[in-house]
């Protein structure tokens, strides 16, 4: 019997699609993972961003990130299904090893997430000091 391992899947969906089509593509990927025996632990939808270079002649992509646990054999089955989905510009599934998880903890310890309460508090303090200086 195979043991479940932790994986992360990063997706770039065609950003020119309507919100409903993007939601359908996300639901498809999540459904495939769960139907094949995986268990989704977190979903982070980053949103529309400009790509670094054109992918399939598209320059805007909708970025999303899914963390899940699954057996090794499930990954090939999931890739087989999502590989031919036309709305997905790119995808990458990687196994999260203990070294990667440790590195992630160190990065999170020393970084502030953009849009976090700490970040907005710093921005408000900077804006307040600018108005006082004027």
Curated annotation (Swiss-Prot):
GO cellular component: cytoplasm; ribonucleoprotein complex; ribosome
SUPFAM superfamilies: Ribosomal protein S6
A GO BP entry: translation
Keywords, sorted A to Z: Ribonucleoprotein, Ribosomal protein, RNA-binding, rRNA-binding
InterPro entries recorded: Ribosomal_bS6, Ribosomal_bS6_sf, Ribosomal_S6_plastid/chlpt, Transl_elong_EF1B/ribsomal_bS6
GO MF terms held by the record: small ribosomal subunit rRNA binding; structural constituent of ribosome
Family matches, as Gene3D superfamilies: 3.30.70.60
Pfam families: Ribosomal_S6
HAMAP family: Ribosomal_bS6
Function text: Binds together with bS18 to 16S ribosomal RNA.
Family: Belongs to the bacterial ribosomal protein bS6 family.
Full protein name: Small ribosomal subunit protein bS6
Gene name of the record: rpsF
């Amino acid at each position: 019997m195979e043991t479940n391992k932790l994986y992360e899947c990063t997706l770039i969906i065609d950003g020119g699609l309507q919100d409903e089509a993007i939601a359908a593509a996300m639901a498809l990927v999540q459904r495939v993972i769960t139907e094949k025996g995986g268990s989704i632990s977190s979903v982070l939808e980053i949103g529309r961003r400009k790509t670094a270079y054109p992918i399939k002649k598209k320059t805007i992509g909708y970025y999303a990130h899914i963390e899940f646990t699954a057996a090794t054999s499930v990954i090939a089955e999931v890739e087989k299904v999502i590989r031919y989905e036309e709305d997905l510009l790119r995808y990458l599934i990687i196994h999260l090893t203990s070294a990667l998880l440790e590195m992630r903890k160190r990065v999170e310890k020393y970084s502030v997430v953009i849009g976090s309460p700490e970040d907005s508090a710093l921005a408000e303090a900077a804006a307040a000091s600018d108005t006082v200086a004027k």
